[in-house]
């Protein structure tokens, strides 16, 4: 997945406002070697053991110490200028704690993706919830959000 998706993150990153950091959560595949040999501009934080999904992210966020952290799974591609509006919104709205971009389906980019209920709204506590999904149907992206 790294070879398929990470290039879009590297190519579409604005290095004036963000570093690309891959956190390896104790993987047993060759992810660390791929990052070191094929993605020289990417920073690598490698844990010796797998701390699980939430604890792995939390440890990385604490250790990296950035003002903002943006979490992407390894199966996410991004488009040009995806990051700037999120950053600008956070900078201009200090009372906002979380933002997310529009998330589209990888198999059909005219539809939203709702993996884990993301792709909709985030409530005041930072929990994502769906908008535009009714049971077994998924809303088409017509630029409405």
Model-inferred region functions:
Residues 17-26, 45-47:
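Short beta-strand/loop segment that forms part of the nucleotide-sugar
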């Amino acid at each position: 997945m790294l070879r398929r998706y990470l290039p879009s993150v590297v190519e579409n990153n604005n290095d004036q406002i963000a570093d690309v950091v891959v956190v390896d959560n104790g993987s047993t595949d060759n992810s660390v070697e791929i990052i070191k040999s094929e993605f020289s501009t990417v920073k690598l934080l490698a844990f010796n053991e797998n701390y699980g999904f939430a604890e792995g992210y939390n440890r990385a966020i604490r250790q990296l110490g950035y003002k903002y952290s943006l979490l992407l799974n390894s199966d996410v591609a991004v488009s040009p200028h995806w990051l700037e509006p999120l950053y600008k919104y956070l900078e201009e709205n200090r009372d906002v704690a979380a933002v997310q971009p529009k998330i589209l389906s990888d198999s059909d980019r005219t539809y939203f993706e709702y993996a884990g209920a993301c792709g909709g709204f985030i409530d005041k506590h930072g929990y994502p919830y769906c908008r535009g999904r009714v049971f077994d149907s998924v809303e088409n992206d017509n630029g409405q959000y």
